[in-house]
Amino acid sequence: MTIAEEKQAQRTAGRAARKALDAPQRAAANAVLCRRVLELDAYRTAHTLLLYAAFGGEADLAAVAAEAARQGKTVAYPVCGEGFSLTAAVPGADGWAMGQYGIRTPVLERSALLQPEQLDLVLVPCTAFDAGCYRVGMGKGYYDRYLPRCTRAVKIGIALELSLIHIS
């Protein structure tokens, strides 16, 4: 099996594990995950966060976003662009639309934009991960290109425990 085939198999396994959860299990797992994020020093000290809008059974950080907003933190979301680029956008009240992958996404024209080096904390969705915390994403490399530019941010991969897989 090639590396590309192996990664695709890992993505498939990660997505299947997420979809196997029923609604009460998913809600309980998301509540535990969000509570743990809110307890992190990296969260407590962050003023500017990049989260994501959950899609396809991803770990849902809506509770983290709500608490961060309540605390006066700046909450940005990724917008996928040309050349597999990401932009961090803080949406206004009417600043949301369905993005190119069917993901709820900020509308750039109605959002404040942040530079990667302005972020204090980046919570990165993981399709799967291993015991060494190596992340497997969706496969387009958006975050792989973006994260090195987040020079002052703490970067944390986010996934439910069931997304833990064996990566050889």
PLM segments and residue spans:
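Active-site catalytic microenvironments for nucleophilic, acid-base chemistry
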Residues: 67, 149, 161
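A short, flexible beta-alpha/helix-coil linker loop
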Residues: 21, 129-130, 162-163
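Active-site beta-strand/loop microenvironment that shapes enzyme catalytic pockets
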Residues: 14, 118-157
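Conserved small/polar residues in nucleotide/adenosyl-binding loops
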Residues: 165-167
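Short beta-strand segments
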Residues: 52-54, 78, 124-125, 157-159
